[in-house]
Amino acid sequence: MNIVITGASSGIGFETARILAKDRSHSILAVSRNRLVLEKLKPGEEGGNIHIFPFDIVNGNYENELIPFLTGRFNRVDCLVNNAGKLVSKPFEKLEDHDFDDIFNTNVKAVYRMIRALLPYLAENAHIVNIGSMGGVQGSVKFPGLSLYSASKGAVAILTECLAQEFIDRKIKVNCLALGSAQTNMLSEAFPGFKSPLSAAEMAEFVAFFALNGHQWFNGKVLPVALTTP
């Protein structure tokens, strides 16, 4: 399978790319702004089928930068994992307009832009996996300081449901994994001192499995994946 993963330079995205690359039948396009960290995916036995592409998913030129790189290596895309995300932890009264823009541009607009850019290249029966959060699930426990982050992930969940219906005729499946806690830098930023029962690598094991197989059973679903929240 040809798989595109955003936010692949750290945390769950990095580990998901590493896990998927262990199967040499897969080719991975790992996307992130940070080339130096992306380079860590290359060394070793699993590195030969990983293509790294430093790219700003918010401000980058998809048509002139990402797509030429993609089509030079893949003739189609079988799976897209929209993993890149941004978190700001602030009391509501201290938020500024740029916080809103930063969060929604990364967590929502970039997901929209990536799907729109890759749509002509998505294979029949391709799978789009949007990485959401339990904070974006209606009725879930909410936490002070995470209003913008949770709202942005709620938007991703609704976008997932809408696109699953729009893409039925194309036979493209779209699902959202609403993740609970995993030990990442983002979790430490939101909940200093909290220790998750799951490592980033352990959460990535499920994300990788679901990316490859989840569309056999699900379409347009927002699926909680959480031992704790946090």
Task: Describe each model-derived feature in a short phrase.
Residues 9-10:
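Conserved glycine-rich cofactor-binding loop
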Residues 120, 161-166:
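Alpha-helical segment proximal to the catalytic Tyr-Lys
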Residues 115, 152:
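Active-site helix of classical SDR
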Residues 91-92, 99-104:
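Substrate-binding pocket helix/loop in short-chain dehydrogenase/reductase
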Residues 169, 176-177, 192-230:
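C-terminal helical subdomain
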Residues 133:
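Residue(s) in the substrate-gating loop at a strand-loop-helix junction
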Residues 24-40:
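Conserved glycine-rich Rossmann-like NAD(P)H-binding loop of the short-chain dehydrogenase/reductase
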